[in-house]
């Protein structure tokens, strides 16, 4: 296969400053003694600004932290935060960068249900601001409720479309194999629950 990719009409190299990446929690060394404010300020590094810590940029950092609901934790060490709070810190960092596209890698892993709901509320608010949210996940539970559109990948694109329609049995077999009945029981509105009837 061959072709080209454009992001907002630009080549990926030119558009990379418009993309903010939120990594998996377990890929980060949390032993560094950094506060929430300091991590979010890292979003200013590399921006076209002569003074990254000007009053204007400091205000942008604080606004991003407020937007994700961490105002009271702004000076707290990040290694004392919960998994959901850590995800919110990195979302705030990408907002400070001015990213137009947010790419979240396994955003809901090691995060309890309540924290997942908080994250989805924040993500939906960001989406309303006109930003694009891409989330990589292996968890298909409640996928129709969380996402507008889904792309299913297994070495190639198995399916792409509306989240309420794309997860057919044929697509699930292509992604996970016909032997994996846990996934094959999934249909829109059915998350694998079985009461034995």
Q: What residues fall within each predicted segment?
A:
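Conserved ABC ATPase "signature" region
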Residues: 41, 55-73
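Catalytic Walker B motif of ABC-type/P-loop ATPase nucleotide-binding domains
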Residues: 102-106
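H-loop/switch region of ABC-family ATPase nucleotide-binding domains
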Residues: 137-138
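Conserved ABC ATPase signature
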Residues: 77-81, 85
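ABC ATPase nucleotide-binding domains
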Residues: 168-170, 174-197
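H-loop (His-switch) and adjacent beta-strand-loop-beta switch element
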Residues: 150-163
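Conserved ABC transporter NBD signature motif
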Residues: 2-15
């Amino acid at each position: 296969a061959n072709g080209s990719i454009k992001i907002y009409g630009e080549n990926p190299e030119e558009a990379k400053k418009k993309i903010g990446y939120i990594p998996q929690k377990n890929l980060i060394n949390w032993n560094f003694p950094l506060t929430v404010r300091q991590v979010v300020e890292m979003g200013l590094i590399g921006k076209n600004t002569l003074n990254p810590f000007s009053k204007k940029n400091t205000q942008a950092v604080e606004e991003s932290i407020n937007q994700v609901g961490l105002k009271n934790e702004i000076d707290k060490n990040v290694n004392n935060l919960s998994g959901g709070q850590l995800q919110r810190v990195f979302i705030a960092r990408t907002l400070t960068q001015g990213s137009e596209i947010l790419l979240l890698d396994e955003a809901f892993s090691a995060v309890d249900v309540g924290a997942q709901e908080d994250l989805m509320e924040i993500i939906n608010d960001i989406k309303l601001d006109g930003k694009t949210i891409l989330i990589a996940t292996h968890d298909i539970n409640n996928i129709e409720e969380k996402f507008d559109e889904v792309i299913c990948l297994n070495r190639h694109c198995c399916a792409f479309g509306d989240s309420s329609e794309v997860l057919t049995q044929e697509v699930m077999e292509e992604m996970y194999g016909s032997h994996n009945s846990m996934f094959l029981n999934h249909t829109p509105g059915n998350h694998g629950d079985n009461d034995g009837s």
